[in-house]
């Protein structure tokens, strides 16, 4: 088995870390839903199901004007290539097989903002 394939297989079977940023493949989508290969934040690892809840990131900084978004700066901790916006309103469940590698992790203040937005969104 090629080394890259083995590495991807091993990652999909390991424990994901919550509030870490990973590269994910969201495939193709319709409308305004984020797709393709992009960074995303794992907010909840559902390891017993081999799934996780993620928030996709976009490098389109104009997205900040939308509700339920958080700016994620390019820092040593996040290890992003450029400043990005977390699209909290587009959180979704994906199979762990769609995750290819760890990029970085969020700062505590960013985690707090995201948790507050999720609570506000789902206040039923």
Describe the function of each predicted region.
Residues 1, 5, 9-14, 75-124:
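C-terminal terminal-subdomain/extension
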Residues 18-19:
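Loop/turn positions that initiate beta-strands
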Residues 27-31:
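Short, charged beta-turn/beta-strand-edge "cap" motif at the junction between a beta-strand
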Residues 32-37, 42-75:
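Compact nucleic-acid interaction/catalytic patches
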């Amino acid at each position: 088995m090629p080394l890259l394939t083995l590495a991807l297989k091993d990652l999909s079977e390991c424990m994901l870390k919550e509030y870490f940023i990973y590269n994910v493949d969201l495939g193709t989508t319709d409308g305004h839903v984020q797709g393709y290969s992009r960074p995303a934040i794992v907010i909840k690892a559902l390891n017993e199901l081999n799934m996780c809840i993620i928030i996709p990131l976009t490098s389109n900084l104009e997205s900040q004007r939308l509700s339920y978004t958080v700016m994620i700066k390019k820092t040593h901790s996040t290890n992003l290539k450029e400043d990005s916006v977390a699209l909290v309103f587009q959180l979704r469940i994906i199979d762990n097989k769609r995750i290819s590698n760890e990029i970085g992790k969020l700062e505590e203040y960013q985690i707090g903002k995201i948790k507050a937005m999720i609570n506000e969104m789902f206040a039923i």
